[in-house]
Amino acid sequence: MVKNSLSIFKLMKRTIAKILCVGVLVMTLQSYLSGQNNVFRIGFQASPVFSGIRNNNDLIVKNGGSLGLKLGAISDIPWKEHSSFTLGLNFAFHEGGQFLYEVGGNYLPNSDLSDPLLQTGDKPLPDGVKIRYQLQYLEIPAGLKFRTNEKGNATYFLEAPVITLAFLMRGRGDIETEDYIKEQENIKKDLVVPNIFLGLGAGVEYAMSQNNSLIAGLYFQRGLIDFTQDHGNSAVHNPDIIPTYLTEQDDSRATIGNLILFLGILF
């Protein structure tokens, strides 16, 4: 309990530090651009994320999602009268979800786990093991935004496509069986660092003044790259052979999908 509390406290401190860094960056850029005739606009987003994962292997079943947060700087670069390019720099926290592995095996052979027995042998993880993936990314999204004419103070928009380059900064996993639960295990070495997300979204910009606008929208993005290394194996019990497990290399494809409630402000 004490260990988990300390881990949560450290994570909160890191999160607060990153929020402050992003805030300072946005304010510095805004101050600089105020003297440049606002060639482009910048802002800040803090957007809740409903994240889930899926797998092309029928024996690896999605078993719940995660509630996360995207936090970072956004920019709007005019292109034509009713369209613009967008560019950002985000931290994405707690993306991922949970898989139920109907067939156990050694799925985390390279991770820095607290108990070596969790990655020793052909089948350290039993049938029905659940692994919750908690992923933190540094993201660089770029998109093309189309706007309607302003009606009152509101302007509606469609942003598509949105292509996001993502780099894994942190990977944690909760391992759950009938006999034990291991939380916040370091599983980054069994995960793929780069990813690419393809998405789109729509929403509304509400002008509070000539230069300041609130933004609210709904976005969806899908990861195009398998986020697991696939260095592990599944193991089916077979008492007629020695050793008593029939192993198969894990070649499944696991991807992330995010539904994002985009909340931001442009200056």
Q: What do the PLM-derived regions correspond to, one by one?
A:
Residues 61-123, 136-138, 267:
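Glycine- and aromatic-enriched membrane insertion/assembly motifs of diderm outer-membrane
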Residues 34-76, 253, 258-260, 264-267:
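Short glycine/proline- and aromatic-enriched beta-strand/turn motifs that initiate or cap beta-hairpins
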Residues 44-48, 69-77, 89-91, 140-146, ...:
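Residues on the lipid-exposed face of transmembrane beta-strands in outer-membrane beta-barrel proteins
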Residues 54-62, 125-131, 183-190, 246-251:
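Extracellular loop and loop/strand-boundary signature of outer-membrane beta-barrel proteins
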Residues 36-42, 81-85, 138, 152-156, ...:
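Outer-envelope beta-barrel architecture signal
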Residues 58-63, 102-111, 173-182, 231-240:
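Flexible, surface-exposed loop regions and adjacent strand-edge segments
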Residues 63-68, 130-137, 188-197, 251-257:
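Short sequence motifs at beta-strands and strand-loop junctions characteristic
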Residues 195-200, 205-267:
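Predominantly the C-terminal beta-signal and adjacent terminal strand-loop region
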